[in-house]
């Protein structure tokens, strides 16, 4: 899988199908939010552990080895129920490599079902809680929908903000403004 989170059509298709099946099952059992919480807990473990990432990505481990290792991890982490069964199923089916994409696709399906729009926001330094709430309120007004804010700190922006919602992006960073000035000055010579 690509490091930047982009996926090829095969992986996106596998992830989407598995995520949709999980969502439909969770919805039928009234466990959509519980499954999301457990998947988020697993995703946090995945992001923090080099060993877990190796296990998930490596084709060197057999399905039985992956299932046993993941099962032990789920037990220790207190992840159970439908989410745990789903994660074990992906290991049994040799699809563990696609699990991060499945988790993203599941989150997107949950947001979609609740009418929530995801907004990626990049800023140069961590804003205060009040500023974060102001950003959310402004985006809520523009989108006319509830916002799920995904905040990233990117010091290379120098200042300002970059917002991406769906296919729209607004770059009001100081870095971009300085680059524009630099280009204008080159053309003026």
Curated annotation (Swiss-Prot):
GO terms for molecular function: proton-transporting ATP synthase activity, rotational mechanism. Pfam families: OSCP. It is a peripheral membrane protein. The keyword DNA damage does not apply. HAMAP family: ATP_synth_delta_bact (MF_01416). F(1)F(0) ATP synthase produces ATP from ADP in the presence of a proton or sodium gradient. F-type ATPases consist of two structural domains, F(1) containing the extramembraneous catalytic core and F(0) containing the membrane proton channel, linked together by a central stalk and a peripheral stalk. During catalysis, ATP synthesis in the catalytic domain of F(1) is coupled via a rotary mechanism of the central stalk subunits to proton translocation. This protein is part of the stalk that links CF(0) to CF(1). It either transmits conformational changes from CF(0) to CF(1) or is implicated in proton conduction. This is ATP synthase subunit delta. It is found in: Cell inner membrane. PROSITE patterns: ATPASE_DELTA (PS00389). Keywords: ATP synthesis, Cell inner membrane, Cell membrane, CF(1), Hydrogen ion transport, Ion transport, Membrane, Transport. The lineage of its organism: Bacteria, Pseudomonadati, Pseudomonadota, Alphaproteobacteria, Hyphomicrobiales. The keyword Acetylation does not apply. Belongs to the ATPase delta chain family. GO terms for cellular component: plasma membrane; proton-transporting ATP synthase complex. F-type ATPases have 2 components, F(1) - the catalytic core - and F(0) - the membrane proton channel. F(1) has five subunits: alpha(3), beta(3), gamma(1), delta(1), epsilon(1). F(0) has three main subunits: a(1), b(2) and c(10-14). The alpha and beta chains form an alternating ring which encloses part of the gamma chain. F(1) is attached to F(0) by a central stalk formed by the gamma and epsilon chains, while a peripheral stalk is formed by the delta and b chains. Its main location: membrane. SUPFAM superfamilies: N-terminal domain of the delta subunit of the F1F0-ATP synthase.
